[in-house]
Amino acid sequence: MLKSKYIYFFWLLVLFISCRHDVELPPISLQECEPLPNAVAAGCSYTYNNEIYIFGGRLLDGKHTNQHWRYTPQSDTWTKLESAPLKARVSCSACVVDECVYIGLGYSGYIHRDSSYLCDFWKYNLITHEWKRLADYPANTTVKNCFVKGDGCIYALYGFNRQFTQDVYRYDIEKDQWDKMDVYAPASVPRAMDVVGASCQGRHFIGTGFNHGSLRFWAEWNPEKQQFLPRKQKLGMGRIAASCCATDEYVYLIGGRHYGDTLTTGFFYSSIQRYTPQEDKWQYVGDMPYEAEKTVVECVGGTIYVGMGDYPKGIIQNYWYKIEE
């Protein structure tokens, strides 16, 4: 009898250690940086030459903006750039290829109006500061698409209009042409809206979002096979309106909201989760100082910068932090 008790406690300890392997909290530190002069949520961000750019979003007064900002980590300063020719919008997408950023899509206007889903697509030269309008996106699923850089092309994954999608469109940079791809996805990779993604170690990851409930799914986009491959789900409950970025080794998932079945079962996240592609493993690694959705997060030189976003009561913030492990 005593021996069986020891065996029981041994396996209980093994189970505890295996669980801790996923939820342990390696030490991270957050340092407050210079806040963005204008608080914004649902902005579009990208990096170039060790600087962070933020375009568009929603301001404190609820209006959409087309302001374009550049953050320089070395001096911890923000610079407002010249006005962009794009219409003010939220939830647009961007992808940097060489010295240009390809940016557009998004949403602006009244809810569920076709004219509110924006299909315009632009190229901005980060050296000459010239804008050029390119071929329009060929679908109206233009809310929060995930852009992925390919070989001479850009892939636009998912997106939303009035239905959940799983679409992939390929933009040929030389031809200035969009084409819809035939894509395979297993049942464990659902149609969804408000997904997030990032590229790490030459691989492309995407997940979370919403489809009749907040989602935990995580998948890898394989452009050669034109497939979504299921990966280990994120920890905890599902979330929408999260933010995502990658260092050389990890993908980070930050903030967001869990939308429950009723207005009383939803809540916001402050948690930071880290995904290791080589091990297909998630870990909790810390928390932001506040709960928020639709934040901005980017990585420069191995340092993660995160901030802005919507508070639980709909208040937009301009906080800006850097995270170093």
Task: Give the location of each predicted region.
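Kelch-like beta-propeller repeat domains
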Residues: 19-325
